UniProtKB/Swiss-Prot annotation:
Organism: Penicillium rubens (strain ATCC 28089 / DSM 1075 / NRRL 1951 / Wisconsin 54-1255) (Penicillium chrysogenum)
Motif (Cx2C motif 1): 280-283
UniProt motif (Cx2C motif 2) ranges: 291-294
The keyword Metal-binding belongs to this UniProt entry's keyword annotation: yes
Cofactor(s) it depends on: [2Fe-2S] cluster; [4Fe-4S] cluster
GO cellular component: mitochondrial intermembrane space
Region Fe-S binding site B, residue ranges: 280-294
Name of the protein described by the UniProt record: Fe-S cluster assembly protein dre2
Amino acid sequence: MAPSFITIDANDMDVDFSTTKPVQAKRTLLLAPPSIATQEDKLRDLFSTFDRSTTDLQMLDRLSAGVVSLPATTYDLVLILTDTDGTRRSEALQLLTRNVYTTLVPAMKAGAKLQTQDSALNASDAMEAVLAGLVQSDNGFEKPNFEPSAAVPLKFGLKKKNKPTPTAVPSIPTGFAAPMGIDSPVTNHDRDEDDELINEDTLLSEEDLTRPIMPPPECQPKTGRRRRACKDCTCGLADKLEAEDKERRANADKELNVMKLDTGDLNELDFTVEGKTGSCGSCALGDAFRCDGCPYMGLPAFKPGQEVQILNDVAQL
């Protein structure tokens, strides 16, 4: 006897054959200051409040020293144990350094919260949390959920393989001249050759030519400083300053030439030439008024015109 086949109609059965995904429990990380490790009653109360299977306890001093590491993207809530009355707040926040945030933030899931037991963090303590990438929320800080960026392809218009057939151009009957238009065989450069060049100076009136050149504001001299022209000056200030410098140098050279004296103009003291006197005119006053090379150096003062004789290197007044 041949076996009979049995068919099952799934539409008549209220059975769900889809596989259900296990719901992952939310994990909590407790960050405690070192002083709480010596109080067993505090630790017993903590684990009576939080489920031990989904809660981890780490010491802040060990995190700050880099002794322990945290698993990445694991915790939904990070709670800093500062006591409800804030007894251990200063101790905990003092250990909540940048090194702790560097280890803590990667271990938080997207949307995870960072909170304290007593109250929210103040502005100075919250600065490190903001720098670590956390966003301030109602009861603390939250790790933002940044979705990964996706590349969007850009579609450009491609050339069509099958080009459309060009439409036939109607032929011009013989005897008619083609109008001078866009399709005229005359090129643009032929038209440019017929244009006359205009002298730009003719566009300026007499008033424009006599109008003084106003330098731009950036060329105006600052208080107590000399005007300086720009590197690519076009307002004429560079030429004007150069002309002033040339005139100043010419005047200085002219004055220098006036001050030059020839050998015959030197009015130095010379005993071989009659009528010559000392250029300082103070030879008779004393050593305090005489020049460095005065031959009367060391002699007492005498009256101008008084005869002085030197015998055996001794002055005779």
